[in-house]
Amino acid sequence: MLYRSISCPKGTFFMTTPPAAAEIFGDNLEKAIAYHESLATDGSVRGFIGPREVPRLWDRHILNCGVIGEAMDEGISVADIGSGAGLPGIPLAIARPDLNITLIEPLLKRSVYLNEVKEALNLDNVTVVRGRAEEKVVRKQVGLVDIVTSRAVAPLGKLATWSLPLVKIGGRMVAMKGSSVEEEIERDAKEIRKAGGTDIKVYTVGEALLSEPTTLISIRREK
């Protein structure tokens, strides 16, 4: 069993690396642990992670992001928009080193942190781009990818207008969503179609590993 001592304002405590982490991250488990430590300490101090989230980083943030690789074919290109502190892009890159992942983040302090994590963990399959997904300069720099991911970025309709232009025709946006996803689909259906989206699917991943599986919505770019 692996333990790490994490310093926080209320003292020091030990966190156990959950057994599921070894299943999800395999040979890259130590990188996942190092990322967890970075979020719990540096990430919290710099305001990327709220103090209340630190004790539940594994379950609510790292593991549920790592399992989204179940929805992706081998060796594809992925763009993670509004990457923030690297969720879901960094756990995905650790779990799936075969993927080529671009992290798109507009804020300087967060993009600096993402580059620090990339270098510290030797994530050769990660590229960091500072900017917004809807900006022409970013779209030109990133090009077209197979899948665009996101987590807690925007309402579904707006998310589709930002994500789908980065996706190859026939590719997909795959967004992490909560229990209200069906309501979002109904509310934003016209906006999704206008953005060129079709073939909407909702499914879960990580059922065999997580107590609360991750819910994903997948939308294919038709035009």
From Swiss-Prot:
HAMAP family in UniProt: 16SrRNA_methyltr_G (MF_00074)
InterPro entries: rRNA_ssu_MeTfrase_G (IPR003682), SAM-dependent_MTases_sf (IPR029063)
Protein name per Swiss-Prot or TrEMBL: Ribosomal RNA small subunit methyltransferase G
Functional summary from the UniProt entry: Specifically methylates the N7 position of guanine in position 518 of 16S rRNA.
Compartments, as annotated in UniProt: Cytoplasm
Residues binding S-adenosyl-L-methionine, per UniProt: 82, 87, 133-134, 151
Main location: cytoplasm
The family this protein is said to belong to: Belongs to the methyltransferase superfamily. RNA methyltransferase RsmG family.
SUPFAM superfamilies in the record: S-adenosyl-L-methionine-dependent methyltransferases
